[in-house]
Structures are given as structure tokens and as C-alpha cells.
Amino acid sequence: MKNYNYLILLFVLLLSFNLTAQQNSEEVTAASRTAEKLNEASNSTTIISEKEISSKKSFNVLSLLEGTVGVNVSRQGVNSFNVSLREGVDVFSTRTVLLSDGRELNTYGLNFFDASASTLSGLDIARVEVVRGSSSAVYGLGASSGVISFTTKNPFDYAGTTIQVSSGGITKFGGSILAGSAKNVQSNWNLLDVNFRHADHNEDKSFGYKINARYSENSDWLVGDQTSQTIGGELPVMHSFNFDTSLYFKGEDYDVTTTFGLNDTENISRRKMWGEEKRGVSSKFFNVKVNSGNFHAQYNYVQNDTKENYNYWIGADHGIDSQQSHFQLGYELSLPSLSTELNFGADNRLIKFDTGGKVFGSYEDEDDFRTVGAFVSSKTKLFDNVDVLFQGRYDHFNVINEGAFSPKGVIFVKDNTGGTLRLSMSQSNNPDDAYTLFSDFSTQSLGSNGSYMGPYGNKRGLTFNNPTWKPWPNLESFVALHPTPRLDILGISHFHVMLGVLQPFAQTMIQTAMATGNMLLLYPVQNIELVIASMLSGANYTDFILHDGLGNPMDLKGSDTSQLSTETTYELGYSNTIGDKFSYSVDVYNIQKNNIVGMRQVTPHVAIDPATLGAEFGNNLANTAYGLYRNAGLPAATAAALANVYAAVGGQFAAGFAAGIPSLGLVQADQSPNDIHRLYWSHYNFGEINYWGADIATNYEINSAASLYANYSFINQTEFTREDVGDITSPDVYHLNIPKHRVKAGFVYNPDKGLNFGLSFRYQNSMNANTLNSGDSSLFWFDGFVPKRTVWDMNVGMPITSKTRIDLTVDNVLGKKYQTFVNMPMIGQQALFTLTHNF
């Protein structure tokens, strides 16, 4: 309830504003997939203009977003970034949808985006729209975090030819590369980025075209200590080549744009469980977009071919080839009599994966990832200052044959100062990604017979309906000594224990008889074949204890089959301007996540508790000895006394036998191969979490050329355990992997002509990363404590001639090294000189 008290308090405060303000008339299209005013967008949205983009040259376009409120740019290297908005940060994937002119850039199904392997070029970006919050009501399954939409430059408004060359370096040992020694600068000055853009059109602008080409290469910072031991401490030189060309056709009532592009990239990617891998991929895409009146349609095809993928930790090829297609269409309809604007749309997404059995294993022939969906969006003016918006979308996900409806409702209230209050509720549904669904590969060998440990995707669940156990190879011949071994009994036969301790046990009994002079103790030993035969009874078993291989107890429990997770968001936002210079926005949101996915070891080792085996085997042996003595005619009391000696000695040896074998083998799941050991890791669903956060952004325009900005993002809780996800006894954990506090601020001087300058900083507090939501985060490479950091960035540029300019961009001006996650590269300073010439 306390979360809602904060919302109510803020609601009252926002309504109390009574400031002289002006309305923002800028339009955005990414929030609702249709044009709407910025302050009336369905989601909190930020625009990054072409002027801002061109003033800060970057080696990777995602670094342009680092100063934007609510955006978490996870820097993993010089040219390796991941981006997220309000969802938990992942090492590899993102719930943020990235678009270029409406074309999805993510590798659908994997939820993966690599800007260096895309054709995005800073020379060709006209604007960026950052849409924060759930967008599943129009974009479909998986769009729970928001949208980042890049709009490229068309040839009609941006004709001409431009060449841009960037050269720079990095510091690998801290400090400043610009002020470092000549040797240090020489050894690290190895960043190169060459961009080319040409665009033109005919006289009546009915036809236009553009061409973009880019080549870059770079080394990278040193990797973490653990990774360093695996790959020799330094990552290889990486490169990327991108090319795309677009044709634009304009008629009286239509326009058609076709784009073809290709990319060839070698770099480093990281997976949250299996560390670094060298990634080589060649991609090509074709896109056609048609607009006619209120109707639009778009088709996109992408093919990704991996040519050299090698996971350093696993020591194996880990490439995932794919063919991806996306067809979308939409229609906009105005109903003036009802003061309503309607927007309809439908999508069909299909991606086919091919790993050659190396990553998706047994799922290789059933890993097609398809969703089909349709949406409607309706915006109605109820009163002069009140609008309502409803969006709803239904999607069907073929992998688990499940459908889901994602609704969204928004109320807009415009006050008498020109500000807009936005109150919204939305629900999104997220499928597991293909890596979670289909993974089936070896991460560690368990012997020479092909046995291995590795993940198993949750498209199907692992079960133990008919469990058996499989002994380790060195014990197989020993287990086979039983005439009818019962591997369906999860326990050790006392027959095997008897064979295991027979020689030292018999010797001890003989020594005891000789030492005590009680020769009656020899009788069962002299009839040892009768003792062994009695152990063959099916009841003479001691149950195994199950553990994880390190001695930690485990239950015999299968894994869960994939289910859609649900995320419900309540949001209150207010934006306004004070006078002509100061603008601000405040967004407070509450997010409830249900059906969280975690990962755990499913296959247990089998072992024997020494105390239990000692007691049960000793008792069994005593009963056998007692029977032999009674059959020989000894009185009951004498037989019992002698049998107790057998119980004590036999129990002691049995306990030692159990203690000497920490693992006898593995329990076989119903899905386990018969001929090898397979230690499975897989997924399970648990609980729900609830947290709230806020994004506050301010901007002050000193004059037409200079401005100051500051923003703050806050989340009240980022680590969830015990009663946060279930009850006080729950072992489950969930981490957002986002710091609670993030502050960004800066000064920008960017006149239409002459010198431009920018100085900014980014602060975030410390956090504990747990990328797999595992109860033991020490098992995984990138988990652990991440210290707080403050990073200063600077850019300066000036014209040399009317057509040529030079820029310097310095990331991490102070050169204080930091890591995004444990065992990732230590990020130092990066300096980049850029020369741009317009023909």
C-alpha cells in the first residue's frame, strides 16, 4: 500500500502547480506507432535531435543515449554496448525494442541488439525517440521496457556527400591517454572509424536515393581476472563493415522506400552464464515500406550467418544462424463526430534458427520462433482538457501454443498552465527468449564417454516420473556384480556394500575372534556366502541422499515448462515548461512482475549418508548373523550378543564405505540419454515482485546556443529475496541489476556556427549483480559486487572551413577504471578525434 501512497502524494503535488508555461508542439511516432504531440504521447518520451547527434561524435551510436533520463547503457567494451530502460539489465539481451525507420533491429527471439553489427551510422541519424515504459499494447510480446526509435535522414531534406574519419585510443591501465607517455599512446591508439554518406534526388523530388558505408576497427580494454586466465588477458582486434542503400519513390498519394544492407562484424559478445565468446557474423537485410493515405505496410527480411563463433569458457563453436522476417500493416481512421482517432495494425514475426546442433541440440528441428498479433489504438477527446487513450493487442506465441492480451489505458489532463498530467495502466506479456527455450549443449565434460553438464531449454520440462540412477564409469563394473541390479531404486544395495567392505570386514572379525578367544565369531565368516546371499533381498537398500556435487542437499524436482510472464505497470507523469527556458518532467511508476524465471541445477548427484548406512547395514548384518547362529542351535541371548558385534563392526565399515564415495553417479531424468551421464541445468518459474521508481528530467536553456540539463532515476528496490518473491523460507532471488540511484547532468554549448562544447557526468551507486537469479551467484562469471562510479565525458568541435570540421570526444575524462559487471573489461578513458568533410 505504501507504493500507492507515494503516487497519491505526487498526484496532489503535481495538480498544485500553477506556473506560467508554454505547450510543447513537437510530435513523436514511436510511442503509439502513430503521430502524436510529445506531451500527449502514451508513454514518457524523450527526443534527441539531429543537432544534438551531430555535435557529439561517437564510436558506437548507443553512447548517444548515455545522458538520457531512464536509459541504462551497459558498456561492455569499446564497441560493445547493451541498452535497457525499465526492465532488469541483462548481459546479452534486452526487453527494449530498437527501430530504424520502423524496422526492428533486434534479433527477434534472442532479444539481442548489437549496434556495431547494424547499419546505424551517426552521419545518417536525423533524430532518436526514447519511449520509456511498457509498449506491448502496440508492439507485442516482449516490448515490456520501451522503445528506442532511430529516424534516418531522407535524401530530400539531407542531400549531399559526407566523409567522416575518426581515430582514437584507449587507456588500458588507467589515467589519461591524451596526457600519457608516448609509448602508452602509441600502443593504445588503435581505434579507426570511417563513415561515408551520399544522398541525392531528382528535380521534382519524386525519386531519391542514399548510400551509407562504414568501416571500423578497434582493440579493447583488458578483461577481468577470471576471463584473463581463460583467454590470455587480452581480446583480439575487432572490426565491422556496414553498407546500406535506400531508394525513395514518391507519388501523388503514395510513397515507397526500399532498403538493402549488409554487415560483416567480428567482435566479442557475452552471455550471462557462459562468459565471453568471439563472434563473427555476416548479415544482410531487405526492407520495403509503403505509405498510401492512412494505410501503411512494411516487410523486413534479415539473414544472419555466423562464420567464426568461439566461446572461450566452453571451448566450442557457439554460433546461432538465423533467418528473420517481419510483416506489418496498419491503418489510421479519424472519427471527427466522436472526437476519436483510431489506429489498427497487425504483425507476423518469424525467425528460424540454425545452430547445427551445437547450441540448440535436441531442439534443433523445433526452434522456429513465431508470433502473430493485432492491435487497436483509440484516442478520444472527452473534454477540452481531458483525453483518454485505449490500446489493446492480442498475440499468439507458437512455441508454447499460448496467446495473451496486452491492454493499456491512459488519461491525459491538461492544466491551465500548459502542463500535461498522464495517468496510465498497462499490462505486458513476455515470452522466454530462444536461448532460454532451446539451449541444449555441453558446458563441461564429465568423462571420456561423452557425458557432460549443460543447460536444457524450457520448451519442455524435465521430469522424474520414472527416475533411475546411473553410476559413474569407474563404478559400473562394480554395480554390475549384482545379479539383478535395480537402478530404478534410488538407493545402495547392501549386497554392494557387503562386497565393498568384505575383505577388511572379514579380516577384522577373524582378528577379533583370535584376540577374544571367542571362536563363535568366525561362524558367519565361514559361511560368508550365506551372508552375501541374504543381502540380495530387494528390501536391503539404503536410500541415497541427493546433493549438487558440492555437498549441498537437493530435492528430486523437475524443471518448469515455459510460460508467459506478466508485467503490470501503473504510471503517473507530468511535464511542463516554466517560461521559455526551463522544462521538466516527472514520471513515477509502479511495476509488478509475475512468473519470474530463474535457473538452477536439476540433476542431483547420489551419495550415501555414512551414519544412516552404518546403522541400517549394521542392523541388516546383525539380523543375518543372528539367524545363522540360531539355525546352528545357539541360545537367543548368545546369538544376539554375537550379532551385536557384527552390527558394530559391519556398521563401522559401511559408514567408511559411504564416506569414501562422495558421489556414486547421477539421477537420470526421464529425458536423459541412456548411454551417457547428463547433468542438467534448467529453468523454473517463481513468485512475483513489486517495485516503484521515478524518472525526473530538467532542462534549462541559457540562450539559443547553451543549455544545462540534469536528470535523476530512482528505484526503491533492486534486490528481492525471501518474502519479496514468495515467503520467508523461499530460496529464490531476483535482481534487477540496476543501481537504485542514477544521476546525469551536463552543460551543452551548441551554436549553429562556430565552436561547440559539451561536458557531462554520470553517477550510479553500487549494486549486487545476479544475472541468472540464482541462489548461488558465485557460480556465474558476471555476478558479484559492482562499486559505485562517477564518469565524466567531454566533447568539443570547431569548423576548419565552411565544409570541414574537427571534433574531439573524450569518454571517462578522469580515466578512473570501472566495470559494468564483474569480470568484464575495465573501462578506462577513450579519446576520439573526428574529421568531417561535406562535399
Question: Residue locations for each model-derived region?
Answer:
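Conserved C-terminal beta-signal and adjacent last beta-strands/turns
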Residues: L7, H198-F207, R214, S240-F241, ...
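N-terminal periplasmic "start-of-domain" segments of outer-membrane beta-barrel proteins
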Residues: N24-K56, F81-N82
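Extracytoplasmic beta-strand/coil segments of soluble accessory domains associated
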Residues: K37, L62-E104
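Short acidic/polar hinge/loop motifs at secondary-structure boundaries
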Residues: E104-R132
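Periplasmic-side early beta-strands and strand-to-turn transitions of outer-membrane beta-barrels
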Residues: D157-A159, Q164-R279
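Gram-negative outer-membrane beta-barrel transporters
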Residues: Q164, K381-N385, T577, K581-K593, ...
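Surface-exposed extracellular loop regions of Gram-negative outer-membrane beta-barrel proteins
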Residues: Y209, S216, D220-V223, S240-N267, ...
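Outer-membrane beta-barrel signature, preferentially recognizing the C-terminal barrel domain
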Residues: E277-G280, F285, N291, G319-Q324, ...
